[in-house]
Amino acid sequence: MDTDKNRLKPAFDFSSGESSVLLYQGQAEMRIEGNIYAGDGKIRLDLLPRANIHLYGYFSGVSLKDAMETSIGQKEISSFSINGHQIEGFMISSGPNAAAQQYNIKWCPKSEPVTVVGDDSTQMTRVVFHLFNFVDLFGTRRSTEQNGTAMHAIEHVDLACDGWKVELKSLLSTREDIKKLEQEGGYRLTHIGEIQKADQTSFTRKDADDCLYGLRFFLSFAKGGWCEPICAVGFDTSGNRVWESWSSPKDSWQNPLTWFDPHNSSQISSLFPGFMKRWADDDWREALREVIYWYLNANFSSRGIDAGIILTQAAIERLSYEYSVKEKKLLTSKGFKDLLASDKFRLLFSSLRIPLDIPPETPNLQTLAPADQMNWLDAPHALTEIRNSLVHPEHKRRGQFGNVYYEAWNLGLWYLEMGILAICGYSGTYGNRLRQRWVGQTEDVPWKE
């Protein structure tokens, strides 16, 4: 292992364990009807009770009438800005600070990310981002960092495609923080990342936004739950911070089932080029965005596996339409619409060489399959029959499949994971969610020759 002198470090101090982290401070301005007040502003990442970016304003000289009427809702703050950038949103709380002779407000932006540093013309050579609640992975390479007299292993994963390179890096505190997350839940910084052009040339804010948006869905698909790059900072050739984009982690800690085995990080390195090639296509970007969104919600088992069954099959049908109709033109839109749901699944899975048989890892489904029971022809038939019993109140089998809901939920998600991997041209190994397995135990995807 080589000693790592890498410049890649967090751009903000998330290590203190505080529930509110200062990201930026500057000049603030608010408008109460026709009156404009100037003061100081701060942008913070608040982690409790739920992670959010909030803006805080501290204003002197606010008239008593405006302060009172705003506090009781008779007047509204019509605009709030920091450094001349108006931030659309709404006031959460307000009130006087008698000791400081100030009127303070807390403002929630309408959407994230929030940007007041840099603009569309800003050029940068690298972007540093932060990952909260990612997985405890073994890197594709390893370095060391010193902490006091001790040397610690640092894990790195390198992703590359189409002239871009992305590095994911663990921290000295990663393993300890993941243990705390497993015990306490919540939000903790576990990894940082860096985006650069392979030739070290500059790129624009739009380039950075596009790459970060793709990484949001790629990394979330790898984890099996929302895990997006947040609080990105762009640096120019001199190392100056020229662009900042602040956002919050979407979900608190969860450790869902997923195809990605964290001890085999080469899996995501291998998938990345094919995924981003699909992502670069407008139609496929929209399809993957929808499908992965449904996948992530379906995979959150505590929200209900019956709902997860329905969401998963909506995602499979969407994937089948994009692949079978729009890309391969195997049939028309009308022809696709006229198919049974099970045939839409068969069309996709057969085309991608994903097996149709009900697997032995779902013994309760296998028990119900024979002709003297449900007479299910294959897994698509079983999955769609169970889904139909949930969504159609008049279904003759409604309420009769409770003992196989978990297997149907898990099998449907396995098919969805395999479909996404195959469509992205992946032919490596994966962790099979259908099997009880150790971390590090993987197998080849079914279509690998």
Where are the regions that the model predicts?
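Alpha-helical repeat scaffolds in large eukaryotic proteins
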Residues: R216-S220, E317-S320, S324, H395
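Charged, non-catalytic interaction/linker regions at domain boundaries
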Residues: D2-Y293, F300-R303, N403-P446
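Solvent-exposed, amphipathic alpha-helical segments
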Residues: E290-A298, I386-P393
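Conserved mid-sequence domains
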Residues: I358-Q373
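A glycine-rich, aromatic-flanked flexible loop/lid motif
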Residues: D283-L288, L352-P355, P380, E385-N388
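Long, well-ordered mid-to-C-terminal structural blocks that present hydrophobic/aromatic surfaces
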Residues: V291-P359
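Short, solvent-exposed secondary-structure capping/transition elements
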Residues: G224-E228, Y321-K329, G399, T429
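Charge-enriched, short contiguous segments at helix-coil
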Residues: I309, A369-R435
